[in-house]
Amino acid sequence: HRPQFLAVAAVAVELAPDDPHALIQESRLLFGLGRVKEAFKVAEKARQRAPKDAVVNATWGFLQLARNRNGEAMAAFEDAIAQDSTRGEPHLGLGIALFQRNRTDAAVEEMRKATLLEPSVSLYNSYLGKAYYEVKQDRQAEKYLALAKQLDPLDPTPHFYDAIRRQSVNRPVEAVRDLQKSIELNDNRAVYRSRLLLDEDLAARDATLGRIYNEVGFEQLGL
């Protein structure tokens, strides 16, 4: 339904071309469809009109991450946090940016803050689970990925991350089930295409599934 939502957002911008909230909604939907250059241009307009808006700056931060501009992304997320301390999204973004700089402890802490501020958001719990997996805290990783699955049964993200985690702890059959589930749910993703541009791409799922099938012994199904 994202193209339809984008059409509605475009009409809203036509009706109120100087409204930063209409602009940033259009930008986020464009970003969700993978149209990053267009999203960036629209977000620039929103930022010119509302440079101190937390949603505008958080979106700007994710767009900077997509353009591999880590420093600018971090600055945008820090601005967004200062402008609205109740939102989890900029903490998630800052956590991703910190991971890119190998500042893993600080990254985990930011992602933890996102889940504390908005505990019912599945996506934040997915990324916190993945963060704990990256720092080899498997029990915590398992806990938050399980919670993410409960919070949003239609989100493929926690199943994808849990497949990788389960394979790493020698539970390949369960890993296959999780990865198949993530592929089945793939078309139900919302908000961002490839979930903030990390590694949610369907091709990545297929490649991971092939490797896991091979390790389980289903070579004929592997890549």
Can you describe what each PLM-predicted range is?
Residues 32-33, 66-67, 100-101, 134-135, ...:
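Register position in tetratricopeptide repeats
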Residues 2, 36, 70, 104, ...:
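TPR-repeat structural position
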Residues 20-21, 54-55, 88-89, 122-123, ...:
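Helix-start (N-cap) detector for alpha-helical repeat units in TPR-like alpha-solenoids
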Residues 15, 49, 83, 116-118, ...:
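Structural marker of alpha-solenoid helical repeat scaffolds
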